[in-house]
């Protein structure tokens, strides 16, 4: 059983959902993002998504695009991202790590080499937002060879013909994009989520995480009442950005502010079903 499957099984046994926070690698610098990564499990993270900075993040809104620019300016590369995971694993063997990004950096690295190095570093799953199932052969084989889950995105616009294809090529969990458009732009209503989830449940036995548009503890709690996990990205990145100084450097309270927000989200998720 994979680390992702074990974590979801353990949470299901406790009848609680998962909180999946997101951070952008090397935002605003390598050491700050590593310190944040290391502190996230203690602040309430059940799984963690690490964004791989890319120069053309077309699925992301302005907040995460700005984070990607900061990460690239700080020297982020795929090798540095994997090094960060390796260093995280020195102190945490249990928290699942998912890399989220775009195909271009993986192709530049070499898909087979990337999957081998990612697994060796301690990565558990991959979300490649611009890799449709029809073109996934180049990554699915190497990922399976090294025990990496390929997490698929399902959107409100995914119709009943396409949904089984997407789910058939997925492992780990399904990432339900709760809104149309880019990240961080609006929030799905509870009614919209309640209507969408039964269709997903009928198509897959995998856990379902809801992302894109979850910003507050209340929204995270509402998400895990109908799904298995809530992903929070733009809201945490916005808090980090607000803590930076005029030159874009980490402030004295950067970690404290982001982790306090994460703790509030974690409390809401833990208590959502009680």
UniProtKB/Swiss-Prot annotation:
Disulfide bonds: none annotated. Its EC number is 4.2.1.20. NCBIfam families: trpA. Belongs to the TrpA family. Tetramer of two alpha and two beta chains. Pathway: Amino-acid biosynthesis; L-tryptophan biosynthesis; L-tryptophan from chorismate: step 5/5. It holds the Pfam family Trp_syntA. This is Tryptophan synthase alpha chain. PANTHER family: TRYPTOPHAN SYNTHASE ALPHA CHAIN, CHLOROPLASTIC, TRYPTOPHAN SYNTHASE, ALPHA CHAIN. Keywords: Amino-acid biosynthesis, Aromatic amino acid biosynthesis, Lyase, Tryptophan biosynthesis. The active site is at residues 49, 60. GO terms for cellular component: cytosol. The alpha subunit is responsible for the aldol cleavage of indoleglycerol phosphate to indole and glyceraldehyde 3-phosphate. InterPro entries: Aldolase_TIM, RibuloseP-bd_barrel, Trp_synthase_suA. It catalyses: (1S,2R)-1-C-(indol-3-yl)glycerol 3-phosphate + L-serine = D-glyceraldehyde 3-phosphate + L-tryptophan + H2O. It comes from Gluconacetobacter diazotrophicus (strain ATCC 49037 / DSM 5601 / CCUG 37298 / CIP 103539 / LMG 7603 / PAl5). The keyword Amino-acid biosynthesis applies. GO terms for molecular function: tryptophan synthase activity. SUPFAM superfamilies: Ribulose-phoshate binding barrel.
């Amino acid at each position: 059983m994979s680390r992702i499957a074990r974590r979801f099984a353990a949470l299901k046994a406790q009848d609680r959902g998962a909180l999946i926070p997101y951070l952008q690698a090397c935002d605003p610098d390598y050491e700050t993002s590593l310190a944040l990564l290391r502190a996230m499990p203690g602040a309430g993270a059940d799984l963690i998504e690490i964004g791989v900075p890319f120069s053309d993040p077309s699925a992301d809104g302005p907040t995460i695009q700005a984070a990607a620019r900061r990460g690239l300016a700080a020297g982020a590369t795929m090798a540095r991202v994997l090094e960060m995971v390796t260093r995280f694993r020195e102190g945490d063997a249990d928290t699942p790590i998912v890399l989220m990004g775009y195909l271009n950096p993986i192709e530049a690295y070499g898909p087979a080499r990337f999957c081998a190095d990612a697994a060796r570093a301690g990565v558990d799953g991959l979300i490649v937002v611009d890799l449709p199932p029809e073109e996934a052969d180049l990554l699915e084989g190497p990922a399976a060879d090294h025990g990496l889950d390929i997490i698929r995105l399902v959107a409100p616009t995914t119709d009943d013909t396409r949904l089984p294809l997407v789910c058939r090529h997925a492992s780990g969990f399904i990432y339900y994009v709760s809104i149309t458009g880019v990240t961080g732009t609006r929030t799905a209503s509870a009614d919209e989520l309640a209507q969408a989830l039964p269709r997903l449940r009928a198509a897959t036995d995998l856990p379902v995480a809801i992302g894109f548009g979850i910003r507050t503890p209340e929204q995270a709690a509402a998400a895990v009442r109908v799904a298995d996990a809530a992903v929070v990205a733009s809201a945490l990145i916005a808090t980090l950005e607000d803590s930076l100084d005029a030159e874009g450097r980490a402030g004295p309270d950067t970690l404290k502010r982001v982790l306090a927000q994460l703790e509030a989200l974690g409390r809401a998720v833990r208590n959502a079903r009680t």
